[in-house]
Every structure is written in C-alpha cells, then in structure tokens.
Amino acid sequence: MRKSASRRLIAAASLLLSISAADAAASPTFDVKPERGLLTRLLHAHASQFELGTIAADGGQERFRISKANGHIKVEGSTPSALLFGVNWYLKYIARVQISPNGIRLGSVRTWPLPAAVIEKEATYAYRYALNQNIDGYTAPYWSWPRWEHEIDVLALSGINAMIVERGMDSVLYRTFRAIGYTDGEIRDWITQPAHQNWQLMGNLCCFSGPISTSLLRKRVTSARRIVARLRELGITPVLPGFYGIVPADFQQKFPDAHVIPQGEWAGFTRPGWLDPREPMFAKLAAAFYRYQREMFGDSSLYDMEVFQEGGTSGDVPVPEAARDVQNALLAAHPNASWMMLAWQGNPREDLLDGVDRRHLFIIDIDHDHVPRDDREKDFRGAPFLFGGIWEFGGRTTLGANIDNITDRLQRLGRTNGNMVGTAVFTEGMDTNPFAFDLFTEMAWRGQPVHAAQWVADYVRRRYGAADSHALAAWKVLLSTAYAIRIDDVKFNSERDAAQESLFNAQPSLTVNRASNWAPEAMRYDAEGFKQALPQMLRVARELRMSETYQYDLVDIARQTLANESRRLLPQIKAAYDGGDRRSFESLTRRWLHLMDMQDQLLATNRFFLVGAWLAGVRSWASTSDEAARLDYDARSILTTWGDRKASEGAELHDYGNKDWAGLTHDYYRVRWRSYFASLDAELRTGRQGNPIDWFAVGDAWNHSARRYSDQPHGDAYVIAKRIEKTLNLESPRP
C-alpha cells in the first residue's frame, strides 16, 4: 500500500463516525428498499431489471460489484452510496444511458444488456460531499419537494454521501434567541429571507427583506425535515450548520455582561456580532441551539461553522481558546461530530488550527489552486480535507471548467497528501456544466488520472445515444476550448477556475469586460475555435436530437456562442462611438440588441434557462400578498442588484448572480443596453453628454416588477440555433 494511501485510511478512520455511509460499512447488510425507490423514480420500468444486494466492505473501503443473476442485472454495495454508484457505473458503461442534473436519456431499448463479466470497484475516497452553502441562495432557496427529491436522487446516484442542509435553520435560530428573551418580532426582523439567508448563517449579513413570517418558518422546517429524512434513507449524511457565536447587533445591549465582538461589514451589509466563545452565555446558547436542532432534525455527525468567513475579526479574543470552546460546545452536544469548515481566503487560520482537536475537523479545500498549493498535509497540520471542485460562481450559466484540475491534479494531491480523504462538489450553483459534474463525481472512484479524450468519447455515447461523428467533433472542440481553461492566465484575485461571463449581462459600459466584479476579465479560451462546436452539434444525426440531454447541450453551446460574440462586438461599438461614426454605431448596436433577442428566444426553449421557473417556485411559500411581494423581491434581487444600493454599488455585488435566462435577458439585460445605447446615440446626435443612468434604480425597478414569466419552455431550439449559425456566418463542417 502506498504511504499516502495508508495515511489516508488512518485519517478516514478518525472520521469513521462522521459519515453515516461509513457506519453502514461496518454492517454487511442494510435495507435496499430506499435505493429501489430511487431507481423506480429515475429509471421507471427499467428499474425492474435490477436486483439489489449488499456486500461487506473490503478492508474498510467501500465497494460495489456488478454481475448478473436469474436474468437480472445484479448490483451489490457495501453502503447505500456504493450500491447506487454501482448502478450508475452500469448505466454509464454498459447500458450507455445517462442520468444527469440537466436531463435524463434512457434510450429506446426496452431491455438493457446483462453485464458480460463481473465488475468490482472500490472507492478511492471515503467522503463524497456535495453543495456549496451558496446553493441555498443561487439555486435552491425556493425549491419544492419534487424538485429537491429529484436533485437528491441524482446526487445519490452520483455517489454523494454527505450534503449540507441549511433550510430550516432559521427556526433553530428563532427558538434559540426566543428562549433567552428576544421577542417574536425582534428575532423575525433579524432573520433574513431564504435567497439571502445562507450568508447570515455564515456570519456575513442579517435582516434583508424581512421580517420573515412564522408561516414561512414552519413551511421551511417541514420541508427540511423531509429533505433530511430522504438523505438518511439513501445513506447520505446531512451536514447541518453549527453554532459558533453569531448574535443580533443589539445583543450587548440586552446582555451587558456579554462580550460581543462587532464584525464590521461584509459587502456593505452589517455583519452579525460574534459572541466570545469563552463566555458562559456562549455555552448556554450553543446547548440550546443544538437541543432545538436535534428536536427538529435529529442528530448528525458533521456541522458546518464558518468563523471569520470572508472577513470579520477576532478582536481581543484569543482565537485558539475561542476555537477550542466552539469545538467543545459541538462535542458536548455531539461527541463524535466533526467541524466542517472551508479552506478559503486565508481560512482556516493557523491560530484556529492551534486550538482544536484536528481529528474532529472536516476541511473543504476550495483554495488549493487559487494560488496553487500542494502540501495540504502541512498546511492543515494533518487535519482531514476534501478536494473541492468550484468551477462556477454565483449560479451563473457560463459553460466551461478547468478539466485538468479534475482529471490530473485531484489524483496528484491525493497521492501526495495522506490527509486527503474525499472530494467535494462545491460550485456556487447547480444544474450547469453537467459534463464537469459527471467527471468530478466519478473521480472519487478512480485512483489514476483519466484520459480525457476517451472519457469524453464515452460521455458522448451515453449522453446522445451513439458515437455520432459530429457530436464527437463538437466535444473535441469543447475539450480544447471551454474545458481547457488554465489558472495561470488570469490575475490572482479572479475566479481562476471559471470561464468568462457574457457581456450581454454586464452593467453597460463601452469598456466593460465582465458582468460581476470578481469574474475573469477576458476570454479564457479561443472564441473562434469554440464557434466550430455549434455547426457540428447541428449536424448530429436527426434520430439523436430529441433527447433531453442533446437539447440542453445544443442550447448551452448556442447560448455560449452568442455570449462570446458580445466580446467581439463591443470593441467595434466603442470604436464607432469614439470615432463619431453614428451610422456604424447604430448599425452595430442594432446587431447587439438583435443578438440579445435571439439569445432570449433560444433560452425560452429549455426549462433550465427560464427566469419564470425560478420565480414560479416562490409563490407557494407565501401566505399573503405582502409576503409574496417580499419573497419575489428576495428571489429577483439575488439575480440583479444582489442587495441594497450600498451592497450593489459600493461593494459591487450587482450582477454577481447573473444568468442567461429567458425573460431576464429580454426584460432586464436588454433594457439596460437599449437605454445605454440610446443615451450614447443622443450624445452623437447632439454633441452633448447625457446624464448618467442610475443602474441600481433600473435593477430595483425590475426587482419590484409584478410581471409574470412562463415557467414552461416554448419554441424550437434546433430552428433557433440554425438561425444563430446563419446570423454569425459560422462555417459549416465538411461532410
């Protein structure tokens, strides 16, 4: 056994009680009824072909076995997670069908083939975590149970065995602070609405778009209980927020003897105060928090606490002592629990690591390549960590990722760091880049680098139903462009693993180079090369074009092709304006707006690109018309201004959550650019400079708009994509 693998097993063993799947591994049997239910939901009639069973783990490592028995496909696993990933392995590499976050393709064959030989695999990494805390803001704040059920099914089938649940924690906070004397109104004013609430749990803000209603608190608890129960059924550990000391701003006034450290601001928002963990009041609050949390959601063994997340200060509090007391409060309530924390922007601090029992840490490392660091055993002082994949920020729809980071660097760090015990899907949004998701989740079951070209060929076959030459050619283009971005060609403070944004979504300016403040400023790959993917996709065999997976990819590639065109066109518009060439300026800006119209029409054809689907989910959570308006504002503002004027303009949070979505493109992004171009055209006509446009007011007007949008797709994606090909004069591939 390699030395690093041996150290990894030791590190994983120290967390054995922290993952329910690992608990299940200790027993050779478990009830497979929940897994059978999942197959029925996802595979429908095909589920009857499977015989599910259990096997013992091999030396502590999870494993699955695929075979045939009595004319059935037999899949056995040592844990629920291993069993389900074994089913997925069969689907991917024998049946050659796909279950993905962005569509399902089961094919037209009634009976899937039996495996020709026995297949056995062991998990390389014991822990397969999913979901950034920001998912609850940028993707899922208003999801219904059917939507969550489907997402959990896909995650479980992808081998995930730990997932954060933040929904419902507002009620835990509510009961905790009510118990020490806060009034109902005071604490509901403090608790933030759902789309912004996870930043409160991380200690970044409070009080946005409140007050939260008691009805909404109850609904969210009911929903969260259902989510947590399903996770446990499928062998997924629910990761719950822990208590590390956030308190309302007036806490010191109510409790003069308490020692509260003001945390200043985060992006223009006043942060919650931080109660000194050495205080008796801290222990009292923590005990109450965990007690109420247990009553509502039961026990877990992983608790997320982000102390000093993106700022904050320890003041005069010794961090080692404070960290020890935070951990002790957790262990007093849950003796075998581990403290999950992010490695991000300087965290975890060295002095924090000094004060804790590092065997009870669970570090999600999403900072390992911000400035490339390879010795995470040294950096984390042996504390167990997971390799985090974060190729998307803000829930944005941008296509692309640093695939070398997944196919090569992940395994390299695993070989050289004995404390690397798992992987973590940590994108800030979900349901984008299904290719990267599929590849990343598979890496926890592979110990060696993957040959990307071969993996893509297999991916194309299962995603579309055949090894179509045009589909393969399109993906060869994608693999050499959007999925070949590098971290060494962008400045340090950029989102180095993400692709560039669409300038259509940017706050208008002739010199703008990104929509959100921290995004890459330039193309991350050859835009001309990328263009060749669309003509190839349009020539995929007709019989393969109707699948949900092909339709999604066609829209995504055509959408990205149009988005990239914005970066070619804007400098031409600027040159015409600077040169006083009004005729060229008007012609070019008409083309710009026409491309945006085409973009909106294209996006309207697919359910994953509809702002109407996002907003439709909000209405069922409201109990009154006033609450409906507040929640609608909450859901809209996270896409546009993000917060109030101070946060939007002063901290430049505007458009951080921008998305290529039908309705949003036409009624918000296009309106901004049309107004801006009209202002510049008037300047060219009159020679007088116009008044500056109040972009926050434009965004806030859309946030408060009552306009409804369809949550159902309409139109023909193929026809519109062909029109885009013609409009952009893309060269058709040779037959």
Cite the ranges covered by each PLM segment.
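Second-shell loop/turn segments in exported
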Residues: H72-G77, D136-Y142, T214-S215, D276
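Catalytic-core regions of glycoside hydrolase
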Residues: A47-Q49, Q98-I99, I104-W112, L131-I135, ...
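Extended, compositionally biased alpha-helical segments that mediate assembly or anchoring
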Residues: N658-P735
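Bacterial N-terminal signal peptides that target proteins for export
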Residues: R2-I10
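C-terminal substrate/ligand-recognition segments
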Residues: P520-E543, V555-D578
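Contiguous, structured surface segment used for ligand recognition
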Residues: A25-Y125
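Active-site-adjacent substrate/metal-binding segments within catalytic domains
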Residues: Y125-S144, L155
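Bacterial N-terminal signal peptides
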Residues: I10-S20
